[in-house]
């Protein structure tokens, strides 16, 4: 098993280039199932989740060439509609293949998903929507078995669901007639999926709002154009927090500041200033790091995927911070590990109270999921001594070239084998 050794209390400086968004690239790669032509996608991050999805598509018969952050996908060779457990169990985003496979072939079997261990994240909203479009759905031996010719309908999502929205948008693309989706997720990753499908010839109205109208092609495949994945706002937020927790001046390149409004607002409340250019953000050190109150919510609110990183940052604040996690249960699994480093954090249900300003000490800690693991790295950067972060395969699922990027900023971080 590999682990990271991190020497704390060093200042950071310099520039870091932000990768393409994993959570945008996943549905965009899957959307190639809807294509009649070979699809070229640029700025694809080279992370474990992407490789898992590519192996799933190859398992279904697609031809994929992935190198230098570009993916060339040909799904004309698809000859299989069963997404097997062996691959799907590694990553819950595999469920995204359900809508497009069903829409294209009229039947598919997709194993129930795995991935991060953060709460239930049920797929019932996906299944209810597909049933409303005429699908016959059964759960058999751990697989979603779906069949039927999809027809447009009006669908109201009971809760905002990002993967649910993406799945049904792709299903509606090849369905017969108009689909109206209400209470759709507005995340930038969902918006890019819609824009790419529109550029591929799909008639779609309301992009960027919570109401979409999609005029399905009745099985006719789409003609995709070459495109690039948007920058990863969560990776960007993580590096901003790294600069903040070490109270350093750093610059992020190839980033979209408009996708980070909620994160930047909280950094400003904590006393940090930022300089925003067209595709860069510079974080300036704070005279005093102030406590903050955060409540997670759907975009454009504060992202749940940045909650753990801000909890680490709040440990350096002069006072008591509150984090209210509204989206997922089990999203405080990093707390017990932060306590090992001397953190003062109290949990009451979905609310965490963080008393900042106490010295953090290096420790051996264990990553439990993707974002929690980044919080441990941030805490290690601020702790006195040398920490070891174990089970970093969680990090490799979502952060590209993590230690190289941190080393480029001056962090003392090494990947080692146990």
Swiss-Prot record:
Chief location: cytoplasm
Annotated Pfam families: EPSP_synthase (PF00275)
CDD domains (UniProt xref): UdpNAET (cd01555)
UniProt xrefs under SUPFAM superfamilies: EPT/RTPC-like
UniProt GO BP: cell division; cell wall organization; peptidoglycan biosynthetic process; regulation of cell shape; UDP-N-acetylgalactosamine biosynthetic process
Subcellular location(s) per record: Cytoplasm
Similarity-based family: Belongs to the EPSP synthase family. MurA subfamily.
Its biological purpose: Cell wall formation. Adds enolpyruvyl to UDP-N-acetylglucosamine.
Official protein name in the record: UDP-N-acetylglucosamine 1-carboxyvinyltransferase
Taxonomic source organism: Campylobacter jejuni subsp. jejuni serotype O:6 (strain 81116 / NCTC 11828)
């Amino acid at each position: 098993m590999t682990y990271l050794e991190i020497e704390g209390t060093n200042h950071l400086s310099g520039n870091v280039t932000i990768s393409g968004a994993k959570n945008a690239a996943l549905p965009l790669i899957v959307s190639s199932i809807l294509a009649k032509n070979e699809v070229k996608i640029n700025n694809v991050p080279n992370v474990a989740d992407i490789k898992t999805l590519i192996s799933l598509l190859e398992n279904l018969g697609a031809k994929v060439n992935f190198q230098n952050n570009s993916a060339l996908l040909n799904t004309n060779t698809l000859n299989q509609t069963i997404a097997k457990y062996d691959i799907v169990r590694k990553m819950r985003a595999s469920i995204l293949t359900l809508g497009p496979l069903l829409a294209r072939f009229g039947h598919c079997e997709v194993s129930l998903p795995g991935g991060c261990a953060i709460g239930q994240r049920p797929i019932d909203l996906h299944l209810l929507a597909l049933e409303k479009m005429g699908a016959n759905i059964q759960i058999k031996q751990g697989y979603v078995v779906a069949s039927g010719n999809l027809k447009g309908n009006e669908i109201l999502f009971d809760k905002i669901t990002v993967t649910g929205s993406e799945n049904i948008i792709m299903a509606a693309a090849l369905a017969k007639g108009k689909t109206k989706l209400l209470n759709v997720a507005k995340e930038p990753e969902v918006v890019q999926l819609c824009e790419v499908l529109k550029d591929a010839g799909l008639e779609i109205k309301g992009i960027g709002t919570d109401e979409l109208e999609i005029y399905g092609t009745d099985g006719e495949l789409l003609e995709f154009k070459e495109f690039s994945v948007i920058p990863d706002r969560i990776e960007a937020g993580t590096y901003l927090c790294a600069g903040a927790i070490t109270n350093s001046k750093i610059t992020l390149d190839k980033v979209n500041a408009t996708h980070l409004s909620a994160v930047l607002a909280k950094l400003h409340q904590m006393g940090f200033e930022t300089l925003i250019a067209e595709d860069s953000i510079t974080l300036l050190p704070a005279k005093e790091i102030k406590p903050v109150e955060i409540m997670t919510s759907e975009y454009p609110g504060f992202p749940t995927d940045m909650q753990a990183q801000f909890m680490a940052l709040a440990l350096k604040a002069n006072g008591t911070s509150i984090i209210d996690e509204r989206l997922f249960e089990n999203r405080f699994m990093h707390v017990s590990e932060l306590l090992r480093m001397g953190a003062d954090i109290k949990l009451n249900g979905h609310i965490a109270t963080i008393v900042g300003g106490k010295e953090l000490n290096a420790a051996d800690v264990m990553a439990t999921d993707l974002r929690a693991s980044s919080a441990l790295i941030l805490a290690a950067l601020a702790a006195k001594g040398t920490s070891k972060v174990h089970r970093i395969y969680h990090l490799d699922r979502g952060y590209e070239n993590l230690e190289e990027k941190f080393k480029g900023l001056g962090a003392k971080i090494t990947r080692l084998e146990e």
